[in-house]
Amino acid sequence: NKNKNKNLYPFFFFFGVGVAFKLVQALQTRLKGLPEGQEKWLLDLVALGTVCDSVSLIDENRANVYWGLEVMKKQHRPGLKALLGVSGTKSDKIDSRTLGFVLGPRLNAAGRLKTADEALDLILSNNNKDAVKRADYLDKLNASRRVEQDEITAKAKKIAEDYQDNSVLVLSDKNWNHGIIGIVASKIMEQYKKPTFIISENEDNAVGSARSFGDFSVADAIHYAHDYIIRGGGHKVAAGVTLDVNKI
């Protein structure tokens, strides 16, 4: 954990999936009866998580993604194979964009609109027929996500027009889908070239997603605003926050 003072590991740019993989590697060396080197077959999932979490692709992260793509090309997971199939992607054309723009959005659509268990069930599926059925369902969910995302983005852009002179854009409205506001924040940030917070207002609390631009750290901004928020966290590029509606 790079945030621990006594951490002596030389690479500091892991996030969730990278730390989980290091744990697996450590267990591999300490538990008896496990074939040596078999953790490499998890690298397809490590690569997927690394790219989709917008982690810096340097050093070990870059190596994990490179070898993860090689593992994925062998298509040993029926679920990911089926998901590539419904998206029309050939195995020899897989690259980091495939992870971030083809597989990632379809897997994430489950958690954004329904439950993340749908995506997990696909990844764990060992049956080709079942995998195809689940992949088709996630593909349709992703299409629905795009429609709702476009609607929220259009409304957010309209609100942003009134705040173009602000150094940071903080845009909110009632009942925007929590699972989609992160994507909307990215799109608004890309258009206006400014750090962006997209916030969904509920009855009492508001839930927001932030995306950074330039040297601005949204995680630091949330940390410094601790007097105004209920909870929040993330990293320099992306973060989430919960606060009282009246504190927006």
Could you describe each region identified by the protein language model?
Residues N1-V19, T29-K32, G37-K40:
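Hydrophobic, small-residue-rich alpha-helical packing segments that form membrane-like cores
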Residues K4-P10, F21, A47, S56, ...:
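Low-complexity, compositionally biased segments
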Residues F15-K22, I183, K187:
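Short amphipathic alpha-helical face segments that pack within enzyme cores
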Residues V19-A26, Y224:
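Generic recognition of well-ordered alpha-helical segments
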Residues Q28-K247:
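Hydrophobic helix-and-loop "lid/oligomerization" segment in the mid-to-C-terminal part
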